Design a protein with these regions (language model features):
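Conserved alpha/beta-hydrolase catalytic His-Asp/Glu region
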Residues: 152-193
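Short beta-to-alpha linker loops that shape the active-site pocket of alpha/beta-hydrolase fold enzymes
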Residues: 52-56, 121, 253-254
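Conserved HGGG/HGGXW glycine-rich cap/lid loop of the alpha/beta-hydrolase fold
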Residues: 5-66, 80
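A catalytic-pocket lid/entrance helix-loop region that shapes and gates access to the active site
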Residues: 118-152
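Conserved acidic catalytic loop of the alpha/beta-hydrolase fold
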Residues: 71-89
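Conserved hydrolase catalytic core segment
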Residues: 87-126, 130
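Conserved serine/cysteine hydrolase catalytic core
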Residues: 178, 183-240, 246-249
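Catalytic histidine-centered segment of alpha/beta-hydrolase-like enzymes
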Residues: 250-266
């Protein structure tokens, strides 16, 4: 593990391999350790970098006055790419990491040459359809609100359980995980608390359609076959708005598709990365 200094913090990252750079960006309950099935595979042909976003382990979880901001995470990604001298890079984002990656491509053009987005939870896009609005209301009621309340009360396990079950789409999913997996998720409880107490405009802003449409880099959109319908609805809107997309369904996988079916996931991404 190495750390890199940014404008007001240091971020931990790991690096392996040589060649064209690939940057992996993890989701809400994650860290740079989320991609073991990808780092070894892609480092055979690429320079692979996986980093822990601000507030996520092993980085400090919280500092007084900090806010969980999409803009800050996107700026961190751009600054990291610049500091490592790897612009323009291919960025592979899982869940909220995909939201961060797309925001970086929009607000920091020239840093990213290709995007792989695995179900970015761009919740404002759900408001564009009646079905999406219903899905958003259910997710807020069944996952976000109870997780927020539990974390505010200091019950990290209940908060993480409610959130994880919500993004998995099945109650009881968290409790079925092996103990080491549950412990790893609980390490990010502080980051989840910070995210859910942030203002919506900070951590979940609505990106204007014209800004999404102006993203000219090629984008691979991925969905898990077993993921909640909500994520497919969001990807439908991204497919409609982005000018250069390729969409694939990962069989037998849920929201954490890179972990559930790494062989298929890696093959699809490898094909996307292949020269034309």
């Amino acid at each position: 593990m190495t750390t890199i200094p940014l404008r007001d913090t240091r971020l931990a990252y790991l690096e392996q391999g040589r060649g064209e750079p690939l940057v992996f960006v993890h989701g809400t309950l994650g860290s740079m350790r989320d991609f073991p099935g990808q780092v070894g595979f892609f480092s055979q042909s690429h320079r692979v970098i996986a980093y822990s976003r601000r507030f996520h382990p092993p980085n400090p979880a919280d500092r007084s006055g900090d806010s969980y901001s999409l803009s800050v995470h996107a700026a961190d990604l751009a600054e990291m790419i610049e500091a490592l001298g790897i612009a323009p890079a291919t960025v592979i984002g899982s869940s909220y990491g995909g939201f961060v990656a797309l925001c970086c491509a929009i607000r920091h053009p020239g840093f990213i040459q290709r995007l792989v987005l695995g179900e970015p939870p761009m919740l404002p896009l759900l408001k564009k359809t009646h079905e999406g609005e219903i899905a958003l209301e259910e997710f807020e009621a069944n996952a976000l609100a109870p997780a927020r309340a539990a974390l505010a009360a200091g019950d990290d396990t209940l908060g993480v359980r409610k959130f994880f079950d919500g993004v998995s789409g099945r109650r009881g999913t968290f409790d079925l995980l092996p103990a080491p997996s549950r412990e790893k998720l609980l390490e990010s409880a502080g980051a989840l608390r910070l995210e859910l107490r942030a203002g919506t405009d900070d951590y979940m802003p609505a990106i204007p359609d014209d800004q999404i449409h102006s993203t000219l880099v090629p984008v691979l959109l991925l969905n898990g076959q077993k993921s909640p319908r909500m994520f497919s609805l969001i990807t439908d809107e991204l497919e409609r708005l982005l000018p250069d997309t390729y969409r694939v369904l990962i069989p037998g996988a849920g929201h954490a598709m890179h972990a559930a079916n790494p062989a298929f996931y890696n093959g699809v991404v490898k094909e996307f990365l292949a020269p034309d």
